[in-house]
């Protein structure tokens, strides 16, 4: 028979990790279920060396460092962690919820869903032969290995701009974007414009030039024009964002808004006892940032505690008084 937990957290990214830690402060019995093979979510797997700019008080904090600190914080408590385990169904029983996964079942009094954007994979560069080239990349695991190399980055969002600024410190860097304007933080765009990064706008990649294994040059074409240019490069990084899939979420009986779980001011979904935090939840004015999700975690945990035992106050003691 499965153990009965007070809170089961679905998702082991930064927001889920902090929710688990905070739940322990409320002396809840908590576990984490994550479909990925490691904790940390996108920052750990896709952006381990990228600076995280929206966690206050920690300048130059990388995705890997953020993950390690959250795990270290959680290590002081007994937290069962189930990795490579996908949640298939969440069914309301009389007194608890039964969670069916790809590996078994779990019983829990409440559920906090912190699954981010769900399963994710990078949006690919769609040019002939792209799969054959070994020096086309979609994420960076060790930036120092590219020191002194000619780097070209495709994209116009925060990731593309941030990586261009990071690579500029160690390598000749070119940034190619199909529009004149970048979809990144204003401060980052200003830093880009003041940097030594070569900016090519509005251009789109049109042809890969190499021996079929190593890409040597990238042909780019000006948007709405026949004008072309050729860029010499050693490595090409594609930052076109990610395709995400919420998988079985639509089968869990929760009210959704464009694949996000609608929550109230308690972070509670349409099903009492099930809460959602981070990028997977929706409410009017919602901003998808790590900092936002970290703030939502205590709200969900405290209301889950109150759901389990209405005599427990939603507003707990401050951590400084514990």
UniProtKB/Swiss-Prot annotation:
Cofactor dependence: FAD
Gene3D superfamilies, per the entry: FAD/NAD(P)-binding domain (3.50.50.60)
Cofactor detail note: Binds 1 FAD per subunit.
Reactions listed under catalytic activity: 2 reduced [2Fe-2S]-[ferredoxin] + NADP(+) + H(+) = 2 oxidized [2Fe-2S]-[ferredoxin] + NADPH
GO biological process: cell redox homeostasis
Keywords for the protein's UniProt record, in alphabetical order: FAD, Flavoprotein, NADP, Oxidoreductase
GO MF terms, alphabetically ordered: ferredoxin-NADP+ reductase activity; flavin adenine dinucleotide binding; NADP binding; thioredoxin-disulfide reductase (NADPH) activity
Subunit structure: Homodimer.
Family: Belongs to the ferredoxin--NADP reductase type 2 family.
Protein name (Swiss-Prot/TrEMBL): Ferredoxin--NADP reductase
Lineage: Bacteria, Bacillati, Bacillota, Bacilli, Lactobacillales
């Amino acid at each position: 028979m499965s153990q009965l937990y007070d809170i089961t957290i679905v998702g082991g990214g930064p927001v889920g990790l902090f929710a688990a830690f905070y739940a322990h402060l409320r002396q809840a019995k908590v576990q984490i279920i994550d479909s990925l093979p490691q904790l940390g979510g996108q920052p750990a797997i896709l952006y381990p060396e990228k600076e995280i700019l929206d966690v206050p008080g920690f300048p130059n904090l990388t995705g890997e460092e953020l993950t390690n600190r959250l795990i270290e914080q959680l290590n002081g408590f007994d937290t069962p962690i189930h990795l490579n385990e996908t949640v298939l169904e969440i069914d309301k029983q009389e007194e608890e919820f039964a969670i069916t996964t790809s590996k078994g079942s779990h019983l829990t009094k409440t559920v906090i869903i912190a699954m981010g954007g769900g399963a994710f994979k990078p949006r690919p560069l769609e040019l002939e032969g792209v799969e054959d080239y070994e020096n086309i990349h979609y994420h960076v695991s060790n930036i120092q290995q590219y020191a002194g190399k000619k780097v070209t980055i495709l994209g116009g969002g925060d990731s593309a701009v941030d990586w261009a600024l990071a690579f500029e410190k160690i390598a000749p860097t070119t940034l190619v974007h199909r529009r004149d304007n970048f979809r990144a933080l204003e401060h980052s765009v200003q830093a880009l414009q003041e940097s030594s990064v070569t900016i090519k706008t509005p251009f789109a990649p049109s042809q890969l030039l190499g021996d079929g294994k190593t890409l040597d040059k990238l042909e780019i074409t000006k948007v709405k024009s026949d004008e072309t240019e050729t860029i010499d490069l050693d490595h090409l990084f594609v930052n076109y964002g990610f395709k995400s899939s919420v998988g079985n979420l639509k089968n869990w009986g929760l009210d959704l808004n464009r694949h996000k779980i609608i929550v109230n001011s308690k972070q509670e979904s349409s099903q009492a006892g099930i809460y959602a935090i981070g990028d997977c939840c929706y409410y009017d004015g919602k901003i998808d940032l790590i900092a936002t999700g970290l703030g939502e975690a205590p709200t969900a945990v405290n209301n889950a505690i109150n759901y389990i035992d209405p005599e427990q106050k939603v507003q707990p003691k401050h951590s400084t008084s514990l």
